[in-house]
C-alpha cells in the first residue's frame, strides 16, 4: 500500500479501519486490474492487509441463527478486525450481492461490512453498517 492517503468520515462506523481496507483494495485493483477470479484478489488483498498491520482472517465461517436455533454456517471472505469483507470479481455489483452481504452476516454482530468488487475497470465498494454490537472471535471458529 504505497502512497495511499487514508481519508476518514465520522458518518461511517469504523471509518479509519474501513478506509485502510479500502486503500489496500485500491492498491490491489491498481496492480492487478480487472479480469481475474476472486481467489486471486483475495490472496493479494490478504497480503496488502497484513502489510498494513491489519488483523485479517480469510475464509471465516460464521453461524447463521434464527432466534435461538443454529441453522448452519456461512463463509465470509474476510474478517478484518471489526469488519466483515466480501469480495466479488464481476462486471458490476448487483442488488443480490448487496442483499447477500447484508443478510447472512446480519446475526454475526460485526458493526461494519464491506462489499468490494474488483471485476470492473473501476473498483466498486459498498459500506454496509450493522447495528448489532457483539461479535464472535474469528480465530476461535463459529
Model-derived regions: residue spans:
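Solvent-exposed, charged helical/coil patches
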Residues: 1-55, 112, 123, 129-142
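Nucleic-acid endonuclease domains
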Residues: 36, 51-53, 73, 98, ...
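Short beta-strand or tight-loop elements
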Residues: 60-62, 74-76, 121
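Active-site beta-strand-loop-beta-strand hairpin of nuclease catalytic cores
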Residues: 72-86
Amino acid at each position: 500500500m504505497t502512497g495511499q492517503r487514508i481519508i476518514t468520515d465520522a458518518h461511517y462506523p469504523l471509518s479509519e479501519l474501513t478506509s485502510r481496507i479500502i486503500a489496500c483494495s485500491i492498491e490491489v485493483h491498481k496492480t492487478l486490474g480487472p479480469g481475474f477470479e476472486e481467489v486471486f484478489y483475495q490472496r493479494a488483498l490478504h497480503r496488502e492487509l497484513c502489510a498494513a498491520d491489519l488483523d485479517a482472517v480469510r475464509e471465516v465461517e460464521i453461524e447463521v441463527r434464527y432466534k435461538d436455533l443454529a441453522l448452519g454456517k456461512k463463509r465470509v471472505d474476510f474478517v478484518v478486525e471489526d469488519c466483515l469483507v466480501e469480495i466479488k470479481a464481476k462486471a458490476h455489483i448487483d442488488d443480490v450481492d448487496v442483499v447477500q452481504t447484508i443478510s447472512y452476516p446480519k446475526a454475526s454482530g460485526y458493526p461494519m461490512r464491506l462489499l468490494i468488487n474488483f471485476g470492473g475497470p473501476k473498483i466498486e465498494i459498498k459500506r454496509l453498517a450493522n447495528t448489532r454490537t457483539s461479535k464472535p472471535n474469528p480465530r476461535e471458529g463459529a
